[in-house]
Amino acid sequence: METIKALEKFMEFDRLQKDCSDKLDREKERRMKAEREIARKNCGGNPCERELESERSNVKRLEYQLDAEKEKVKFYKRELERDRYLSSRYLTSSSDPHEKPLPNYTFPRIKNVSPLTTEATGSVEVAPPSTDVTEPISDVTPSVDVEPEHPPAF
C-alpha cells in the first residue's frame, strides 16, 4: 500500500516537474519577445532596463523552482527504490515496511563449568540451543568498572 502511495507521489511530482518545465519554456519565450520589442523600440532608457531585469529575475526564480522540483522527484524515486528493495529483502508479515525482522541467533548454553585442570574428568553438559526468540541471549550484562579518563586541563 505504501508503495502505491509512493508511486502516486512520484507521478504527481513528475507531472509538476513537466508543468514547471513548460512554464519555464513559456517564460523564456516571453522574455525573448520582450527583449526583441525593447530592441525594436530602441528606447534605451531606465524603464526598459528595469523591465528586462525583472524578466530575467523572474526567469531565474522559475529555474530555481524547476530545480527544486527535480530534486523532489529524485528524492521520491530514491525512496521508492529503497522501499522496493526493503520489501523484497525483508518479507515480513508486519504492515510496517521499515520494520526489519530480528535475526534468530541461538547459542548453546554450557552448564556445570569447572576450572580446567589435568585431573578433572567431569563432563561438561551442553544444553540444546533455544528456539525461543523472545528469550534473551544472556541473563548477565557485562559491567565495566573503569572510570573514563579526563583530558588534562590547560
UniProtKB/Swiss-Prot annotation:
This is 17 kDa A-type inclusion protein. It comes from the Viruses. Residues 17-85 form a coiled coil. Keywords: Coiled coil. The keyword Coiled coil applies. Residues 88-154 are annotated as: Disordered. It comes from Vaccinia virus (strain Western Reserve) (VACV).
